[in-house]
Amino acid sequence: MRIAVAALDGSFDSGLSVVLDVLATANSLRDDITGGPPPYEVVITGLATTARTGHGLSVETVPLTAMERLPDVFVVPALAAKTPPRIVEAVRNHPLLEWIHTLYDSGVALAAACTGTFFLAESGVLDGHPATTSWWLGPAFRNRFPAVGLDDSRTLVIDGRLTTAGAAFAHIDLALSIVRQQSPALGDLVSRYLVIGDRPSQAAFAVPALLAGTDPTLAAFERWIRDHLAEPLLISEVATKLGVSERTLQRSTAAVLGMSPLDFVQEVRLDQATFLLRTTDLTASAVAAAVGYQNVSTLRSLVRRRRRVTLNALRTT
């Protein structure tokens, strides 16, 4: 399998290097399994003969125009831009966009993580497809690319020839998925050597206040929830207190966060419950009561459904 990894000016250093390291590890271990795949042919490519990363390191690249044959997979690691406006500006009208479209139309599989997902979305290849991105970029991604079926709670989304991964160190999951799609056994071995565990969801790492802060109504909603965590809550009553209609609140949470008002309430409660579990000696029942659940089984069920772990595991991780 031929894999081209894009190195661009301003690339996120660890994202680029971890993709290369996972693939190199796969190559070094492939003889350790029965019927291992052929070696991965990895090419670092770009728009010129060198690229300067976000930390100023110079990386030699094979220009896309000089590639002798098409890769099977084209990987776009993240850029080091740290705010949504800078990311959007960096990607808008970038010369890589035309290449992405051309490669995809030629049958090449595309993979991207974190801010790199903005390249795929900006090129249009993600329209009508499910995808993920870094959790803190969800609101900006949703606003700019409404035709993409974004689920930013997921760490990895594979849809045909399109693979997207979440926040910065989801580059590991992205690279490992490329290995696993060709050889599950080799992928498992690589994950063991590199001590990579399954991380199906990035929701546990999201900061509700940061996500809501992109919209004044949602910022007020988030503050109101935290001020009344232990109290019974009706969305219609909260909307009235915020001076908006329930429908307006529903539209805002859907457009910015991709969830319902009740889902957001549950996320804020889970965020506080996680904090209490990890920083206090309160019993599980006391924590449940502190975040508005009279029955601890309700909190247990919510943790299992949304974080995919047990309450005890949440406390110790």
Predicted regions and their residues:
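Short, small-residue alpha-helix embedded
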Residues: F118-L120, S177-I178
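Flexible, glycine/proline-enriched loop segments at strand-loop-helix junctions
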Residues: P84-E89, D127-H129, L162-A165, S177
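Short loop/edge segments at beta-strand edges and connector loops
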Residues: G46, D152-R154
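Extended, subdomain-level signal for the structured scaffold at the beginning of enzyme domains
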Residues: M1-L110, F119-A121, G187-D188, G197-T317
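Structural detector of well-ordered beta-strand residues that form the stable sheet scaffold
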Residues: L110-A111, T132, D151
